[in-house]
Amino acid sequence: MTKIIINVGRQIGSGGHIIAEKLAKDFGCKCYDRELLNLAAKESGFSEKFFEQNDEQKGFFKSLFHTHLPFLSDNNFYHNDFSQEGLYKFQSDAIKKAADEGNCVFVGRTADYVLRDYKNVINIFITANIDDRIKAVCKRKNIDRAAARKFIENHEEQRASYYDYYTGKKWGHSESYDLCINSSHLGIEETEKFIAEFIRKSSELVINH
């Protein structure tokens, strides 16, 4: 099979991360989600904790200056490209570096935009019914429904703002992706199988052309 890159965007509680991991296993490649934070930290010289605090958020420096810069590594502060755009570039470079090394699945972090000029890229967006998403967050976070709904609203607002700002596109809008699918209809397992078959068919079309 030819080299392939799969980008998975997802609503919170949709099972997107689980599906991405299953796709990676299906296609024999590595799945990058929070692992990208470690790669970006290595690229930048900043601590991984700094990237964790600002993951998929447009306002990178809010937590930074409110907490008196505890997340910098030992590298000289002024020798790093210390700006919001600079930090985004470190993460983008980490995504490109991973993509150059072989087949991979990326979860979120505007990977679809970062890799827009790469060949054999498939962009997927996974949604789910709000009730299913609330249940998933309740279980994962051990919180009640009201708190879960608030968690979803707050984090998706941040995620959309981050995506829209850096890509000039709209997070979750169908025109940004090759396939959008609601995991509530088929469940996690069957949704992954459906996506995998779509990817195989799409890859065949790319090869034949």
Residues of each region from the PLM?
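Conserved phosphate-donor/acceptor-positioning beta-strand/loop module used by diverse small-molecule
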Residues: 117-140, 145-153
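Glycine-rich phosphate-binding P-loop
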Residues: 8-21
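ATP-dependent small-molecule kinase phosphotransfer cores
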Residues: 41-103
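Short beta-strand-centered segment that lines the nucleotide-binding/catalytic pocket of NTP-utilizing
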Residues: 30-41
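NTP-dependent small-molecule kinase module
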Residues: 92-96, 165-209
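Small-molecule kinase domains that catalyze NTP-dependent phosphoryl transfer to phosphate-bearing small molecules
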Residues: 61-70, 144-188
